[in-house]
């Protein structure tokens, strides 16, 4: 439960107006995407979505930084083929679709029927990809998604707050487990990433997460560096400090 006045029901707009007088920005992890957007609407300073049910952009920054480190720099993100497997309706899948499209990547998302991304998010991703030279594929075929991919991603099959439903919710996802057989379909130098924490033996096997293609520990470290860079840039923007925007 929130320790702020939001926890007792204060309107988001009122909280935003108070924080405008106290801070250069807001970093908020919450459930409803609309709440973050309302905070941004009434804030005079930057608002960072630290995670919602719909999106997890801060994680994507770290993930793409990790790819850049292993692929020779940010300029080489364009036209990388990335594949996400599992719950393709969750915030990570949505974020890979939109973030990958912005970066000009070829994005493939695979999940079972009933767990595919919303049509409006797919449409937005395709529109952006058409402008950046990327591409979007949504499929129920894990092998199709992973074929010749440069990087394979997955996430837990059960999101925060749904742990009690694990046995039921996990049933549709076993065909999307990232294992050595599936990784063999990707490029020989393909990377494996997981935003962590992972359920070993569920969405990913120990052989993969501990194997030579796994860069999950680099990815975890980059959550620190990517967010430091984001806050530095946003703080400089809020203060009008051009030296922090370079």
Locate the predicted segments by residue.
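Short, well-ordered alpha-helix to beta-strand connector turns
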Residues: 23, 43, 148-149, 212
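Phosphate/diphosphate ligand-binding glycine-rich loop within oxidoreductases
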Residues: 1-68, 200
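Short, conserved loop/helix-junction motifs that constitute active-site signature segments
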Residues: 76-77, 101, 181-189, 211
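Adenosine-phosphate binding glycine-rich loop
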Residues: 189-190, 195-246
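Hydrophobic/aromatic ligand-binding patch that stacks against planar heteroaromatic rings
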Residues: 18, 39, 99, 182, ...
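Glycine-rich phosphate/diphosphate-binding loop of Rossmann-like nucleotide-binding domains
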Residues: 69-154
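Rossmann-like adenosine-cofactor binding region
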Residues: 126-207
């Amino acid at each position: 439960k929130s320790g702020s006045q939001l926890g007792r029901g204060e309107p988001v707009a009122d909280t935003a107006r108070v924080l405008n007088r106290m801070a250069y920005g807001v970093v908020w992890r919450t459930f409803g995407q609309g709440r973050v957007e309302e905070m941004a609407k009434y804030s005079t300073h930057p608002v960072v979505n630290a995670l919602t049910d719909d999106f997890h952009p801060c994680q994507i920054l770290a993930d793409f930084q990790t790819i850049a480190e292993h692929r020779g720099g940010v300029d080489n993100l364009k036209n990388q083929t990335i594949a996400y497997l599992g719950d393709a309706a969750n915030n990570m899948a949505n974020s890979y679709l939109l973030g990958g499209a912005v970066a000009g990547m070829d994005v493939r998302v695979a999940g079972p029927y009933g767990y595919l991304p919303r049509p409006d998010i797919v449409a937005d991703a395709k529109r952006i990809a058409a402008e950046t030279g990327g591409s979007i594929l949504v499929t129920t075929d894990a092998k199709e998604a992973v074929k010749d991919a440069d990087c394979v991603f997955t996430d837990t099959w059960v999101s925060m707050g749904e742990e009690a439903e694990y046995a039921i919710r996990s049933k549709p996802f076993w065909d999307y487990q990232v294992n050595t057989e599936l990784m063999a379909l990707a490029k020989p130098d393909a990377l494996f990433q997981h935003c962590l924490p992972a359920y070993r033996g569920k969405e990913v096997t120990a052989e993969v997460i501990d194997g030579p293609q796994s860069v999950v520990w680099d990815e975890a470290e980059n959550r620190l560096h990517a967010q430091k860079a984001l806050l530095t840039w946003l703080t400089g923007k809020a203060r009008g400090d051009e030296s922090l925007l370079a």
